[in-house]
Amino acid sequence: MEKLARKQVQQLTPYLSARRIGGTGDVWLNANESPFNNEYKTDFARLNRYSECQPKELISAYAAYAGVKPEQTLTSRGADEGIELLIRAFCEPGEDAILYCPPTYGMYGISAETIGVERKTVPLTSDWQLELAGIEANLDNVKLVFVCSPNNPTGNLVKREDIVSLLEMTKDRAIVVMDEAYIDFCPEASTVDLLAQYPNLAILRTLSKAFALAGLRCGFTLANEELINVLLKVIAPYPVPVPVAEIATQALSEAGLARAKFQVLDLNANRAYLQVGLSMIPVLEVFEGWGNYLLVKFPDGDGLFKAAWETGIILRNSPIENCVRISVGNRDECEKTLGFIRNYYA
């Protein structure tokens, strides 16, 4: 059966999500999920009918939240589908390329590889910023440049002036895709205001993080209307199930937004608690984080990761040497994790 698969698929290594890696324990800080399990109501009516391709109430609610027009908003099965839609819509397999800057989110490369589109990489600088000269030197045949801010797994914000420089550099050449999956934890850093000035900008968003709806799989792409219309040509006819649209719309109601804002404040406080506590352990290097996670460099990252795993504290190993990413949980989970690490290095 393997030989019947496309060559790209035969050679593909699937993305190792936190759920694929698994683990057993009672402290799960490996997938940047929210610790809040909010309740929603749905009557499961109309399940005998297909959903709208783009549910109007949901689109209007998210557009209002994001500060854009409904015509600039597309909803999909998580931001991951948005990545795939952009590549399918704008890249010719075997001709065009995408570009991204590791260390960063792995699905940009995997989505391109699955579709048969070339992947170009320009590593981030030593302080996790864009290497603009390297990007410019590699723009031939590039249709999409993916930038994650706050970046996963490093946690930092990409400098706004560098994003503007990149948008100027790629005018009439490529689309800059800003992955803002974690922007709700620092909304002042969003690039949504640049949409009016740059038609080559697309922004990915999700309800998985700050809205505590990772299991719902609901994401958004924000862009100018012309770009959105291109994506509507390739999206599945019924991408958002009826219950998903109903729950997502509730999350974006006045009450839902107030709850999300409160929970973001709580998680940001827990992140600060973790950051201060870990920074007091002399052998650790704690990188400043703006999402719901922190990247920490240990003397022996693999050893710490395995020891935590064995005690039921599930963290996320990183491709960066000796670095482990720690999701921000509730205060009890943060205290347990900090206590374990302190004892490990005592």
Curated annotation (Swiss-Prot):
Disulfide bonds: none annotated. It holds the Pfam family Aminotran_1_2. Its cofactor is pyridoxal 5'-phosphate. It is an enzyme of class 2 (transferase). The modification N6-(pyridoxal phosphate)lysine is found at K209. The keyword tRNA-binding does not apply. Keywords: Amino-acid biosynthesis, Aminotransferase, Histidine biosynthesis, Pyridoxal phosphate, Transferase. Pathway: Amino-acid biosynthesis; L-histidine biosynthesis; L-histidine from 5-phospho-alpha-D-ribose 1-diphosphate: step 7/9. Its EC number is 2.6.1.9. GO terms for molecular function: histidinol-phosphate transaminase activity; pyridoxal phosphate binding. InterPro entries: Aminotrans_II_pyridoxalP_BS, Aminotransferase_I/II_large, HisP_aminotrans, PyrdxlP-dep_Trfase, PyrdxlP-dep_Trfase_major, PyrdxlP-dep_Trfase_small. PANTHER family: HISTIDINOL-PHOSPHATE AMINOTRANSFERASE, HISTIDINOL-PHOSPHATE AMINOTRANSFERASE-RELATED. Belongs to the class-II pyridoxal-phosphate-dependent aminotransferase family. Histidinol-phosphate aminotransferase subfamily. This is Histidinol-phosphate aminotransferase. The gene is hisC.
